[in-house]
Amino acid sequence: MSGTKPDILWAPHHVDRFVVCDSELSLYHVESTVNSELKAGSLRLSEDSAATLLSINSDTPYMKCVAWYLNYDPECLLAVGQANGRVVLTSLGQDHNSKFKDLIGKEFVPKHARQCNTLAWNPLDSNWLAAGLDKHRADFSVLIWDICSKYTPDIVPMEKVKLSAGETETTLLVTKPLYELGQNDACLSLCWLPRDQKLLLAGMHRNLAIFDLRNTSQKMFVNTKAVQGVTVDPYFHDRVASFYEGQVAIWDLRKFEKPVLTLTEQPKPLTKVAWCPTRTGLLATLTRDSNIIRLYDMQHTPTPIGDETEPTIIERSVQPCDNYIASFAWHPTSQNRMIVVTPNRTMSDFTVFERISLAWSPITSLMWACGRHLYECTEEENDNSLEKDIATKMRLRALSRYGLDTEQVWRNHILAGNEDPQLKSLWYTLHFMKQYTEDMDQKSPGNKGSLVYAGIKSIVKSSLGMVESSRHNWSGLDKQSDIQNLNEERILALQLCGWIKKGTDVDVGPFLNSLVQEGEWERAAAVALFNLDIRRAIQILNEGASSEKGDLNLNVVAMALSGYTDEKNSLWREMCSTLRLQLNNPYLCVMFAFLTSETGSYDGVLYENKVAVRDRVAFACKFLSDTQLNRYIEKLTNEMKEAGNLEGILLTGLTKDGVDLMESYVDRTGDVQTASYCMLQGSPLDVLKDERVQYWIENYRNLLDAWRFWHKRAEFDIHRSKLDPSSKPLAQVFVSCNFCGKSISYSCSAVPHQGRGFSQYGVSGSPTKSKVTSCPGCRKPLPRCALCLINMGTPVSSCPGGTKSDEKVDLSKDKKLAQFNNWFTWCHNCRHGGHAGHMLSWFRDHAECPVSACTCKCMQLDTTGNLVPAETVQP
C-alpha cells in the first residue's frame, strides 16, 4: 500500500468478503447475480457477481499497510501499520460482547517513530505479529509482537492514555515486543516460513535475511537488491519470490546463494507479486500504471542441471479491466479468481482461465485438464468410428500376431480380421511369391527365384516377343477362340494370380473348387468362362442358385448363358448387352462383356475396376499378345501406384515400384504395420535400405513401444532380423576383464551365440565344450559364482550342485534356457553375482545377497519388474 492508492484483501475465512483500504477500511460482501437482479446500492463486479458495502472504519489514519488476522475468531480483526510506526488492532463490525473485544484498539508502539512498511501474522502461532519498519540508527527494524500476552508493570512498561481529549475510553499501549531483529537496517517486506513458526524471512535494505527466533544472534542472509514483496509459494514452501524495480527473483531456500530464476525485467517498476493460493506454481505480478497482470506458470519448471542453467517457465498476460490497476488479491478458495481495484476504487471480479492441456493416449483415449477438473471424451455407444480407426486396427492386429506367420503367409489376412479384400489379396500374393520362389530355387538355384518377388510387371517384360496365339475349342460349344500360348513366364504369372498351382499343367479346376467352397459362385463361373468352359460355368451358377445363401437370379444368368450364339446380329447378343448394364455383380457383368466382345477387344473385362486385379491380370495373360499385355500391365501398375491399392503388389512386387505403391497406401491409410511386414517379406537389400521403408519400420516399432507392447516389439525385431540380417544391431554391452579391461566374450570359442545386452561365455551346456574360465587377454581367472564358487565360464550343468535332483533341465529340449543359465549376472550395488541360473534359484526364496556378511537387498533394487506390458493386462 503506497500513498493513497487503494489495496485489497480477501477475508481468510469468509470466501464472500473482502476489504478495500486506502484512507479508510471498507468491508464488502460479494454475492452472485446469476439468477437475481442487482440490488440497490450494490456495485457490479462482473456479469455474475456484485458487491455490497457492509461497514466502513475511519478510526485509523495514516495507514501504510494492513494484515488480516488469520484465525476465525475474531473474524474481522485487522492489524494496521501507520506512518509513525505504530501497529493498531482494529475491527470491522466486531461484536462488542466478544471475548476478544479487549484486542480492539490495542496499539504496539516502537521506541522511535518511523514508518511501518509491512505486517505479517504468524500462520502457526496466530498471536504473533511481525512488523517491518524503516531504519533507525538506534533501534531495530523488525519487531515481533504477541497480541495476547499478559503483561505486568514489572516486566513490560505499560500506560493507559486517552486517544484524544474528547474520548472517555482508554487503550493499552504495548511498547515491549517479544523479539527485536535487524538492527541499524530497514525492513521493506516480511513473511513467515510455513514450515516452522520460528523462521522469519525479511527483505532488508540490501539483503534477504532468514531469522531463527530460537537463536536471534545469528541469521542467514544473501545480498541482493530484490528485497521487496517477499512471499512464499503456498504449495512449495522452499520457493520464495521477491522483486526490485521491474525484476522478479525466484529463490530456493535450500540453495539460498542466488536466485534459481530471474523473470524477464519489466519496463515499469513492480508494485505487487502474489502466489495463487489455489494453483501450484502460479505467480501474478503487477507493474505501476498498468492494466495488465502478468502470470508466470512454474508448474512444469524442470530441475536445473547445472549451476548456470535456468529453468524455463510459461508466461502469459491477462487484462481484467480497461483502467489502470492499483492492486489485486487472489481469492483464497475459488480457483484462479481475483479481485482487482483501480485508483478510483472501481473493482472487478475476474477469473483467470487455464490453458487447456490435451492428452491423446496411444490407445486413442482423449482427455484434457482444465483447472482442477479432468475430462475424458467418451464415444457414443452406436458410434463405430473408433473401431474404424487405423490405430485401433493395428493394435488389435498386433495382439493377434499379425504379420508374424512366415510359413503359411496367407493366414496373416485372417489374423487381420479377414475383413479387407486388399489385405487378403496382398497376403495371398506374398504367399504365392514365397512358395514359387522356394520351388524355383530348388529346381534351378540362383536362376529365377528373385524374379518372382519382382512382380508380374517384370516377369512379363522378360518374355516379350516369345509368345504366339493359337485357337482353342470351347467346352460345351461348337466354337473356337484365340488364346495365347502359355510360356514359362505366363504360367508363373497365372500361378501368382492363384489360378493354377505348381507345375506345367494349366488346370484351373482346383481353383474353381476352392471358390465354390467359399461361396464365390459368380467369380468361379467367370473364371470357368474365361477358360472357355461354358458348361462348367453354367453348372456353377446352378449350384449357387440352389445353395442356402445363393441368389435365385443366378438361374436366370445360367439360362442366358445356355442360349449363347456366336452370331453378331442375333437377338441374344442385343439382349445380353442390355442386361449386362443392369447387373450388380461385376463378375456377371464381365461374363456377358466377354461373350459379346469383338475378337481381341476385351476392354469390358480388363477395365472393370470392381473385378479383382489378379483375375484381370490372369485374363490378360491368356488373351492378350505380348505388346498388348505389356501395355496393359504398365497402365494398370501406374493406376495401382497412384491409388495405393495393395492388389497392385502383384504387379510391382517388392521393388522400388512396390515402395512407391506402399507409400501411397500409407499416405492414404496410415497403416505402417502392413507396410513394414510386407516390405520385410522378400524385398532385396536396396529396397530395405530405402528411407521410406526404414521410416515405416521405425515408426511401427515406436508405436509398439508407445502401446507398451514390448514383447510384441521384441517379436517384431526378431522377425525383422530373420528376414533382414543386416538390421541386427551390434552388441552394445560386453563383460570386460577387471585387470586388462578387454572384452571377455570376444575370444570365447565355446560361445555359440552372443546375446543382446549380455555377455556369455562357456554357455553351451555340453560337458564336451571347452571352458573359458580365464580372461583371453591377460589370463587372469574370471570371478567366481557366489553360490557354486566355481569360476565363471564353467557351464552350470558341470557345476557340482548346479541343479537339484528334482530340478533337472532337459538341455536338448530347452537349449536357450541352458544358455541363459550360464550367463554371468551381478548386482550393480554390491557387485556380487554368479551364474544366472543359480541366481534365479537363490532369489526365488531370498531377497538378500547370497554372499556372507553382505546385507544388500539385491532383488528389491530392480524396479523394472513393476512395469507390466500392456498385452498382459486384462481389460
UniProtKB/Swiss-Prot annotation:
Residue sites binding Zn(2+) 1 per the record: 737, 740, 775, 778
Top-rank taxon, per record: Eukaryota
Pfam assignment, any one: zinc_ribbon_16
Residue pairs linked by disulfide bridges in the UniProt entry: none
GO cellular component: cell junction; cytoplasm; cytosol; GATOR2 complex; lysosomal membrane; nucleoplasm
Family as reported in the entry's similarity comment: Belongs to the WD repeat mio family.
Functional description taken from the UniProt entry: As a component of the GATOR2 complex, functions as an activator of the amino acid-sensing branch of the mTORC1 signaling pathway. The GATOR2 complex indirectly activates mTORC1 through the inhibition of the GATOR1 subcomplex. GATOR2 probably acts as an E3 ubiquitin-protein ligase toward GATOR1. In the presence of abundant amino acids, the GATOR2 complex mediates ubiquitination of the NPRL2 core component of the GATOR1 complex, leading to GATOR1 inactivation. In the absence of amino acids, GATOR2 is inhibited, activating the GATOR1 complex.
UniProt-recorded name of the protein: GATOR2 complex protein MIOS
Organism of origin: Homo sapiens
Gene: MIOS
